[in-house]
Swiss-Prot record:
Residues 580-612 have a biased composition (Low complexity). Residues 571-631 are annotated as: Disordered. This is Eukaryotic translation initiation factor 3 subunit L. HAMAP family: eIF3l. The lineage of its organism: Eukaryota, Fungi, Dikarya, Basidiomycota, Agaricomycotina. Keywords: Cytoplasm, Initiation factor, Protein biosynthesis. Belongs to the eIF-3 subunit L family. Transmembrane segments: none annotated. Component of the eukaryotic translation initiation factor 3 (eIF-3) complex. It comes from Cryptococcus neoformans var. neoformans serotype D (strain JEC21 / ATCC MYA-565). Signal peptide: none annotated.
Length: 631
């Protein structure tokens, strides 16, 4: 006889036990009766499951009817384009179609959940995972995410990256670079948002505290860094960039890239992961490691990252912040000025972009940081950019340059306004109630406040010698005793203090900066960051200003060469040929010569020369052209 246990799974025991009806005075049944009884219970259970599934399907169809028709058509076409790897259509629907439908239907509410639209796309799990990524990005951008949204977005993005990284081979998926950048940038943004939200236990409900205690690894810095480094390693992007910089052929670079890195999807994900690693390491307070991750990335005007304006601006902002954390003010100034010039030139092309608002905010923060850097390291800079800085932060800039306690407060306000929102590496210990109480009793200092204290200590060291620098500007040489009389009271003790301040000024006036031939972002040499230099010979201080004036020679040389080329082109151009008179035109009537009194015909009077064309005022004709016209 067949084994009854072979017709149902062990996990159905609980369901069958719930469906079983207790019978009074239960008598043992024979094997046949027991088998028939189990069959009836099994059929009843499956019938109940089928009814529940049909009921859920009916509810799903009813909800699906509430979705606008244009949204359903968009999702079906979007799914079809992704299946066919139709990159132009995917790009258009992602950058334009999605945002238009959001503005029309879901400006202040959520898009339909992935389970509701699953019948429209044949329950394609890859597409549904990509759809959830857009869904949660919309929730973070437009709405207030709940703790369930935060957890589910993390699980969804991990599912997507596991699919990309752990498949047996490269996945047959092709997405536009704008989507890939937005995906990784949103990944880092949601990580920072969750970290800031998690760092305040007092505002949490009991349910939220319990969920955080059960899931300590959700959005942990280790898991985020693990994903980014895995994408970098899978794509072999560092090896590819090194090969391209060495001038190797396309075939050699493809061989270096390997099976995964040769695919555009993995190569672009690896490239953008390097920039996201820069972002994360800056937020975690490790500027040196942040710049090391970018050692193979080109930051020139023709770099790959310049194809996406948001990526370009984000990269330069965090590189500049890393330089500021290392005290390399000239490098930070060059970085900020470079990307701000680019943004001004490209601004007209991005005013209608859906990312224009965030890009403009980042640029505004860079103007504030530029005001700080140019105060701490005065020197020549782009005049147009500095004009904008003075327009936006003119009052603060005057206070910064004047010095004093007000300047320190202005430095603090500008820094907090424009600096990155740094993260605490270790979250509160939610899994241990006693440790959490101790943490609440003595919470650690905020990461941004710690960076602010370090920054202000550097500012105070520089601001303390600003008065000495202003005095030195008035002299070419001055005795230390005389300088002490102007700066401090008590000539004997003041002279010693003056020498100490001069040494501090000398130290504060130099930093480590990149040279012309440097290749990586960390390479550099010692540079003077001040436009004032001095030497001490005994008790005499010899001062020399090193202000570099604007060079006009190159401007005149370029324009002279341009004028010479224009003149040569004019000389070599052929003269215009006047068209001959048409044969069909009537011949001019000839007037008979007048008869003189002697009967001889008089010679015809000479025709008047045609009047010279009137020269237009303000026109200039080269002399060589005039000579040829006269000839």
């Amino acid at each position: 006889m067949a084994d009854p246990s072979a017709f149902y799974e062990p996990e159905e025991d609980e369901l069958l036990s719930q469906l079983a009806i207790p019978v009074q005075n239960y008598q043992p049944l024979s094997e046949g009766d027991e088998y028939r009884r189990l069959q009836q219970l099994e059929q009843h259970a499956y019938a109940q499951q089928t009814a529940m599934a049909q009921e859920q399907e009916m509810e799903q169809l009813a909800v699906l009817e509430l979705i606008p028709e244009d949204v359903k058509r968009f999702l079906v076409m979007f799914h079809q384009a992704i299946l066919e790897n139709d990159l132009p259509t995917i790009t258009s629907m992602y950058e334009s179609g999605w945002n238009k439908l959001t503005q029309a239907h879901y400006l202040n509410n959520e898009w339909p959940e992935a389970e509701l639209i699953a019948p429209l796309v044949g329950n394609d799990q890859v597409f549904l995972t990509l759809y959830r990524e857009l869904y949660f990005r919309h929730v973070y951008a437009r709405l207030q995410p709940t703790i369930d949204d935060r957890f589910q977005s993390y699980e969804n993005i991990c599912e997507l990256f596991n699919y990309l990284l752990n498949s047996e081979g490269p996945v047959p998926l092709d997405l536009p670079i704008q989507w890939l950048w937005d995906m990784l940038d949103e990944f880092v943004y949601q990580f920072t948002s969750f970290s800031h939200w998690r760092s305040s236990p007092k505002a949490k409900t009991e349910e939220e505290l319990e969920m955080l205690a059960e899931s300590p690894n959700i959005w942990s810095s280790y898991s985020v860094l693990n994903v980014l480094y895995s994408l970098v390693q899978k794509s072999q992007i560092n090896e590819q960039l090194k090969a391209e910089r060495a001038g190797k052929s396309v075939e050699e670079v493809t061989e270096v890239a390997g099976e995964y890195g040769s695919k555009p999807l993995y190569k672009n994900l690896g490239y953008f992961s390097l920039i996201c690693l820069l972002h994360v390491h800056v937020l975690l307070g490790d500027p040196t490691l942040a710049l090391q991750t970018m050692e193979n990335v080109d930051l020139g005007n023709a770099a790959f990252l310049t194809r996406i304006t948001a990526c370009h601006v984000t990269t330069y902002y965090h590189v500049g912040c890393a330089y500021m954390a290392l005290g390399r003010w000239p490098d930070a100034i060059k970085t900020f000025v470079s990307v701000l010039i680019f943004f001004i030139r490209m601004k007209q092309y991005h005013t209608r972009s859906y990312q224009y608002g965030s890009i403009a905010k980042t640029c505004e923060r860079m103007y504030a940081l530029l005001a700080i850097c140019t105060t701490l390291s005065p020197g020549p800079s782009d005049e147009n950019i500095m004009t904008i800085v003075k327009e936006h932060y003119g009052d603060q800039l005057a206070i910064l340059q004047r010095g004093g306690p007000e300047a320190l407060e202005a430095f603090k306000d500008l820094y907090l306004q424009a600096c990155p929102k740094y993260l605490n590496v270790n979250p509160p210990p939610y899994e241990d109630a006693s440790a959490l109480e101790a943490w609440l009793a003595n919470p650690p200092a905020d990461a941004t406040q710690r960076h602010l204290e370090l920054f202000l200590s550097d500012v105070q060291a520089v601001q303390g010698v600003n008065g000495m620098r202003n005095l030195l500007k008035l002299y070419t040489s001055i005795d230390a005793a005389k300088l002490a009389a102007f700066s401090v009271s008590g000539e004997e003790e003041g002279e010693e203090e003056v020498l100490q301040q001069l040494m501090v000024l000398k130290s504060a006036s130099s930093t480590y900066g990149r040279g012309q031939a440097e290749t990586t972002l960390l390479d550099g040499e010692r540079k003077v960051t001040n436009n004032l230099d001095f030497t001490i010979d005994g008790t005499m201080v010899h001062v020399e200003e090193t202000t570099s004036h604007r060079r006009y020679a190159g401007f005149f040389i370029r324009n002279a060469e341009h004028a010479q080329r224009a003149l040569t082109s004019i000389k070599s151009a052929p003269l215009p040929v006047r068209k001959p008179a048409s044969s069909s035109a009537p011949a001019p009537a000839t007037t008979a010569a007048p008869i003189s009194k002697s009967g001889e015909s008089a010679a015809p009077a000479p025709a008047e020369a045609p009047a010279a064309p009137e020269k237009k005022a303000g026109t200039w004709v080269p002399k060589s052209r005039q000579a040829r016209i006269a000839a």
